[in-house]
Amino acid sequence: MLEKTTLKNIILIHFLMFLAVVTAQTAPDEDTSAITRCTAEGTNPVRETDIPNPVNVGTIDDRSCYANYKESTVYGKTWGVYNITFDSNDFDTSLQPRIERSLSRSSETGIGSYARLTGVFRILEVGDTSGTSQDGTYLAQAKGKHTGGGGSPDPAICLYLAKPVYGTGEDADKQVSFDIYAERILYRGGEGDGREIVFLKNVKKDEETNFELEVGFKEDPNDVSKKIQYCNAVIGGDTFNWNIPEPERGTESGIRYGAYRVKGGRAQIRWANTTYQKVENVEVTNPGPIGDVYKLKNVATGQYLSDSGVSASAVIMSDSGEAQNNYWTFVESGSLFNIDNETFGILRAPGAGGPGGAYVVVSTTKEGPSSDGDKVWTIHYNESNDTYRFESGSSGRFMYQEINGNVTHISAMNTDDRSVWKAIAVESLSVDENAILASDVRVFPNPASDSFTISLKTINHVTVNIYDVLGNTIFKSEFNGDTIQIRNKGQFKAGVYLIQLTDKNNNKYHKKLIVK
């Protein structure tokens, strides 16, 4: 009798153990129904369909017609439920299905700016294509736009991809764990071969895994004049830090999470205890070489940037920086600058079909300030060696002296000295030597026609010389007083002229005049 009872107990224990194994393989909130493309419940008129007061942070982006976002309470937590199936994208049908939450982006690039997500995830199932490279589902992604074009208009920087690992024996057809990979760009806008996939770690099915993702900007420890854009993750206590390529092109830091991509089968991901924080620090930059007149010397060649003196013609380089057409000022235009020649107009940075050739920088007769997109520049200052790089707008292209002497604006690393310039103040015009200040002199109207007036604010005795672009003296006179009116009696033809004012201490100031 005892033997029979013992045998029954053994059988019962084995049966209970078997049930425990089955239960462990199926999560309490797992969807075990047949996989279909769409359901009536999951089909919505808009992507923003959500429940009131969801426990997960962020704005829903539901592009799946299989199921809606809902919530479950298991293991002492309330979980956001993200279920998607193959081909269930009812919006933007060329893209992959997803139910994700988008978090407001950190839109500043100053050191200390970041976006940070924390939470806990469980993975129950991911997309399966029978072991191909298309296996898996993204559970989170770092986002961020950049200057200079290339790739998607809203590119992913690093995606965290879960690929299925199948069991053995009776579990050979069951996903029992998941390999987590980082799919990250090799360069800005990288897609396809422009990305690498790096294994991070394995997590078990239905295992509660702590997750933290921070994307932001910090100081480069090797060069305090530069910064790093980073994407750092902590998954289940393991840290995976990565620096994003071309940090100078990054314009923001963002995060999305949920369930995204299923090229076969179904994906089920759960998120709980999500929090989000962002910090936005405005980038502090050198205001640029303003308030004086400069010669711009290319670091690689030692030559000086010169204006051609002809509108829509390519600028040139010269061995000497002493001619008037080598003198430049920087005119503020909002947060950007115009680069203004003392004898002609502001520089233009055309595109591939520019009048001087593809991306060749050309002269204009236009006065600054101008907000025209092809006439504004971002000034990048390197404090460590007192040099500048001039970026056309926010394009990621920099003023560059080519080997053939042409001056273009192209994508170039900051280590390429052909894109690096010295701004050398013209000594005779130095404010430190009591030169006439720019704010002390006005010329109006400018452009002029029949006459123009020179107004002097703090001085009352000057010699006025007016030159044409060839250096010929067109007008010369001495004046006492604070206002000088000059009539055009035919000596000023249509074109650009340089006004030179010299005070009694031999300080000089140059002002440009345009005659229509």
UniProtKB/Swiss-Prot annotation:
Residues 1-24 form the signal peptide. The record marks Q141 as: Neutralizes the sugar carboxylate group at subsite +1. One of its GO terms (cellular component) is extracellular region. The active site is at K143, Y260. Ca(2+) binds at G42, N44, D62, S64, A67, N68. Its cofactor is Ca(2+). Its main location: secreted. SUPFAM superfamilies: Ricin B-like lectins. Residues 430-516 form a propeptide. Disulfide bonds join C38-C65. It is found in: Secreted. The keyword Phosphoprotein does not apply. Optimum temperature is 29.5 degrees Celsius. Belongs to the polysaccharide lyase 28 family. The ulvan-binding domain binds strongly to ulvan, it does not bind other polymers like alginate, heparin, dextran sulfate or iota carrageenan. Presumably it serves to anchor the enzyme at the substrate, thus improving catalysis. Notably, the catalytic domain alone is more active than the full-length enzyme with the binding domain attached. Possibly, the ulvan-binding domain helps the enzyme to act on ulvan in its insoluble form embedded in the algal cell wall. This is Endo-acting ulvan lyase. It comes from Formosa agariphila (strain DSM 15362 / KCTC 12365 / LMG 23005 / KMM 3901 / M-2Alg 35-1). The lineage of its organism: Bacteria, Pseudomonadati, Bacteroidota, Flavobacteriia, Flavobacteriales.
